[in-house]
Amino acid sequence: MKRTKKYPFLTLQRQRFHLNFENASSAAGIPAERDFYRWAWSALKSGYRRADISLILLDEEEARAYNRDYRGKDYATNVLSFALNEGEILPCQVSEKLYGDLIICPQVVLKEAAEQGKTPERHFAHLTIHGVLHLMGYDHIEDDEAEIMEAEEIRLMLAAGFPNPYQEDGH
């Protein structure tokens, strides 16, 4: 019997990480589901032993409705994060379990990637990591918070084999 190669992101049941992934978008050029698992886990593993996250890909109209209804902004955005246990822990503090929902709008992500000269995969990876960090309590409203969050995003993107997400030319 041939043994299959074990990948850390495919053996997440032992880590008690559950990502409920749903692609409800009509967009083409979306990375594989396993890539979203891998990117989400790369951000989570430094702060949580267990997590239960829903990640849904929505078309622009639905993403716009969520952004309007929950943030008061009437446009589709690239990623929305809804932490269900928000305020319970501090960023980088190891906790027992994280619960949250991520909404990603592929049409917005693909448009931004093209405008910024990035590959779609790179931009999807960045926004998945960015969204999970929001679930973990990171924010970028204040300059000092933004500096901390961006440093963590850069670290995680480099560890995943991608360049700095805040450099448009890929260097």
Curated annotation (Swiss-Prot):
GO terms for biological process: rRNA processing. Keywords: Cytoplasm, Endonuclease, Hydrolase, Metal-binding, Nuclease, Ribosome biogenesis, rRNA processing, Zinc. Coiled coil: none annotated. It is found in: Cytoplasm. GO terms for cellular component: cytoplasm. Pfam families: YbeY (PF02130). It comes from the Bacteria. Zn(2+) binds at H130, H134, H140. The keyword Metal-binding applies. Its EC number is 3.1.-.-. Binds 1 zinc ion. PROSITE patterns: UPF0054 (PS01306). GO terms for molecular function: metalloendopeptidase activity; RNA endonuclease activity; zinc ion binding. Its cofactor is Zn(2+). Single strand-specific metallo-endoribonuclease involved in late-stage 70S ribosome quality control and in maturation of the 3' terminus of the 16S rRNA. Belongs to the endoribonuclease YbeY family. This is Endoribonuclease YbeY. It comes from Neisseria meningitidis serogroup A / serotype 4A (strain DSM 15465 / Z2491). The gene is ybeY.
